[in-house]
Amino acid sequence: MIARIWSGASRLYWLLLPFSWLYGLITALIRFSYRRGWRKVHRFPLPIVVVGNLTAGGNGKTPVVLWLVAQLQQRGWRVGVVSRGYGGRAARYPLLLDATTTSDQCGDEPLLIWQRTGAPVAVAPRRSEAVAALLRAQSLDVVVTDDGLQHYALGRDIEWVVIDGERRFGNGWWLPAGPMRERAGRLQTVQAVIVNGGDARPGEVPMRLAAGPAVNLLSGERRALASLAPIVAIAGIGHPPRFFATLRAGGVTPVREVAFGDHQAYQQQMLDALVALEERLLMTEKDAVKCRAFARANWWYLPVDAQLPAGAEEALLTPILQAIRRCRPTADGEAKL
């Protein structure tokens, strides 16, 4: 129902408009208070890059974060990542991830980023505290924040917004009548707009998610997606239909598709009930970080990577590299650039 309301297919959004106006007023006042200096903005002696959304729901933000971290690491820069840690509940914050950290503590996305990149990752409700914790523990050149576009207490140097190219902004209204955290005009103030799927408009950077071979949760074996049939597909992400569409685009039609809520907490018995003996369970990589501890031999996940046009790489990275150079000794910065 909420998807129909947000897409504009249902007129029921009218009933929620009073709450949306209130949401919009509050968020505008919060941003205004930071811009006027009435609230403290925490700044740090290195570049902060925010990769965020204007809308609620999955837009492909985390693959962009993974791409950015990898690009900076390949150039020799020391990258840290901070996150709110949605879906996690740690005993204390800020929490620095290590080999003993679970998704129950830090959330699924931070754990996925840590496992994929090896970059130091910290989570905290106040992202500035997460940045401070990273800097106490590591020598870093740049920090990337996974989400947090609307977390104005954290000063930032670069802002990227990721948009779902098919859904874009839905009916255009603020939460809860629509999907918007901020209005579309906010795009005029960011350094890059990256569009996941669909058609990018002038000035936007097109991106697509490319699936790799499926990976077994227990053994790490990699196999071609088509060789896994029959498949039961599950997705506990912001927009499950995108995952199922990726499977069909890869030539696989699952015998069943089961959509869960974002940051779903799984149990072995729950997933066992979905799969017959001859079937294989296929999930997103984000789901896999929560299921690996109790996985079965027939459970697989599908990693995806952000693919951007070759010409966009330089345009996206140059402002970040310049910001790093400004914050580092000239010789050190030029050596890495």
UniProtKB/Swiss-Prot annotation:
<protein>
    <recommendedName>
        <fullName>Tetraacyldisaccharide 4'-kinase</fullName>
        <ecNumber>2.7.1.130</ecNumber>
    </recommendedName>
</protein>
<keyword id="KW-0418">Kinase</keyword>
<comment type="function">
    <text>Transfers the gamma-phosphate of ATP to the 4'-position of a tetraacyldisaccharide 1-phosphate intermediate (termed DS-1-P) to form tetraacyldisaccharide 1,4'-bis-phosphate (lipid IVA).</text>
</comment>
<keyword id="KW-0547">Nucleotide-binding</keyword>
<dbReference type="InterPro" id="IPR003758">
    <property type="entry name" value="LpxK"/>
</dbReference>
<keyword id="KW-0443">Lipid metabolism</keyword>
<keyword id="KW-0808">Transferase</keyword>
<dbReference type="Pfam" id="PF02606">
    <property type="entry name" value="LpxK"/>
</dbReference>
<comment type="similarity">
    <text>Belongs to the LpxK family.</text>
</comment>
<dbReference type="GO" id="GO:0005524">
    <property type="term" value="F:ATP binding"/>
</dbReference>
<dbReference type="GO" id="GO:0005886">
    <property type="term" value="C:plasma membrane"/>
</dbReference>
<dbReference type="GO" id="GO:0009244">
    <property type="term" value="P:lipopolysaccharide core region biosynthetic process"/>
</dbReference>
<comment type="pathway">
    <text>Glycolipid biosynthesis; lipid IV(A) biosynthesis; lipid IV(A) from (3R)-3-hydroxytetradecanoyl-[acyl-carrier-protein] and UDP-N-acetyl-alpha-D-glucosamine: step 6/6.</text>
</comment>
<keyword id="KW-0441">Lipid A biosynthesis</keyword>
<keyword id="KW-0444">Lipid biosynthesis</keyword>
<dbReference type="GO" id="GO:0009245">
    <property type="term" value="P:lipid A biosynthetic process"/>
</dbReference>
<keyword id="KW-0067">ATP-binding</keyword>
<feature type="binding site">
    <location>
        <begin position="55"/>
        <end position="62"/>
    </location>
    <ligand>
        <name>ATP</name>
    </ligand>
</feature>
<dbReference type="InterPro" id="IPR027417">
    <property type="entry name" value="P-loop_NTPase"/>
</dbReference>
<dbReference type="GO" id="GO:0009029">
    <property type="term" value="F:tetraacyldisaccharide 4'-kinase activity"/>
</dbReference>
